[in-house]
Amino acid sequence: MGKIVAIANQKGGVGKTTTCINLAASMAATKRKVLVIDLDPQGNATMASGVDKYMVDATAYDLLVEETPFDQVVCTQTTGKYDLIAAYGDVTAAEIKLMEVFAREVRLKNALSTVRDNYDFIFIDCPPSLNLLTINAMAAADSVLVPMQCEYFALEGLTALMDTISKLAAVVNENLKIEGLLRTMYDPRNRLSNEVSDQLKKHFGNKVYRTVIPRNVRLAEAPSHGKPAMYYDKYSAGAKAYLALAGEMLRREEIPV
């Protein structure tokens, strides 16, 4: 059965979408079958996968609200070599429409129930807010991966996020776990980065990935070219870091790399 991982943080600009597409591409490069679900109305994961969000025939809105069959919604041609459920502005409307339907919190879970066995990993790019789309992601997921910058107030924000995840788990998914905490945009020359990193390891132990994602120009440039970093510059520090993260995740799952 494929593992479903929600990638979430209530704070924007922490590398959530970057992590989603680059981790997915790295997993796909290890011959795993991967699906990315873009639940962020901005559609950044869609565009960074080389898919024009203005040209797609169907989006996550159709999957969640219209209950369009999965095979009519999924995009199989992406630059990251993973499958994709795209997002566009209409995903914002899904928030309103879902309020009107029965079992609105588990629409995504139900939609994935018949296809999750077709994938090794399903990564969900969540919106940077707590709404019905995020709740659907949490209800469907086995675990939550939290990307976070090593910056001032990071620990305070993380405490609030952990509390939110705990409350959601109690209501919609009692089996939901923390997959791991990922340090992003890390600069080893910055004393604050090192101090926050040390505090994270002190408080959360082995939940903090050993892999660290550095600040990297090529990693930041890649989405504007519609590619994950490994297909934009495979020798960049960012591309190598996400390949290392994929390997670390597989080892945690005791899956041969």
Language-model features: where?
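P-loop NTP-binding core
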Residues: 1-257
